[in-house]
């Protein structure tokens, strides 16, 4: 796995430091050990591949984490990730719990408030785990490639994603087994 090499980890640390350090007020943080690569093909809903709106907390990511989402190709219109403003995310989340909304209802409400994360290669979005985000059907003829990773602020709630397993210390790299 390329993510497990020291060379890749150093490049990832440089990238994360550049994107996140100032925005996290200089706080120390850990870095997700393995990044995710996302591929959004044209008309992906036809193939059952649309990523429903969700928040990281629903998948075990604690509120002490931040996601960094970065397109590798142009990301715009319907081929990009969609995100909801913070207050809309909080309101919909509260209603989801209070009224026991199903995924269909969550999707309908999120569509009313979502905005496209238009970005070019070299640009990134940094957001909290409580932000609702997801995809809509890619109606463009362009496949969007992106990657995402997460940082855990020192002392932050990590949910089910444990330091030392899901995260590694910034600037520390695994040594290959001999």
Region locations from a protein language model:
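Signature of the catalytic double-stranded beta-helix
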Residues: 1-46, 51-63
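Residues in well-ordered beta-strands of folded domains
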Residues: 36-40, 54, 69-71, 82-84, ...
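Catalytic core of non-heme Fe(II) oxygenases with the double-stranded beta-helix
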Residues: 47-119
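Residue-level detector of short, conserved catalytic/binding motifs and their immediate flanks
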Residues: 66, 123, 145
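Short beta-strand segments enriched in hydrophobic/aromatic residues
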Residues: 72, 131, 151-153
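A structural signal for the main folded, soluble domain(s) of proteins
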Residues: 94, 122, 126, 154-161
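Conserved metal-binding segment of the jelly-roll/cupin
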Residues: 117-132
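Non-heme Fe(II)/2-oxoglutarate
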Residues: 136-178
């Amino acid at each position: 796995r390329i993510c497990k090499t020291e060379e890749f980890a150093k490049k990832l640390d440089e990238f994360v430091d550049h994107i996140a350090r100032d925005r996290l007020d200089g706080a120390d943080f850990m870095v997700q050990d393995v990044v995710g690569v996302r591929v959004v093909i044209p008309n992906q809903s036809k193939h059952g591949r649309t990523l429903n709106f969700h928040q990281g907390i629903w998948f075990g990511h604690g509120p002490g984490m931040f996601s960094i989402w970065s397109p590798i190709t142009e990301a715009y219109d319907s081929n990009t990730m969609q995100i909801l403003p913070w207050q809309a995310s909080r309101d919909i989340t509260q209603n989801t719990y209070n009224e026991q909304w199903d995924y269909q209802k969550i999707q309908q409400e999120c569509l009313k408030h979502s905005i496209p994360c238009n970005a070019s290669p070299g640009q990134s979005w940094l957001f909290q785990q409580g932000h609702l985000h997801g995809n809509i059907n890619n109606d463009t003829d362009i496949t969007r490639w992106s990657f995402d990773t997460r940082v855990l602020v020192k002392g932050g709630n990590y949910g089910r994603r444990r330091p030392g397993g899901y995260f590694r210390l910034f600037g520390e790299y695994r040594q290959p087994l001999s």
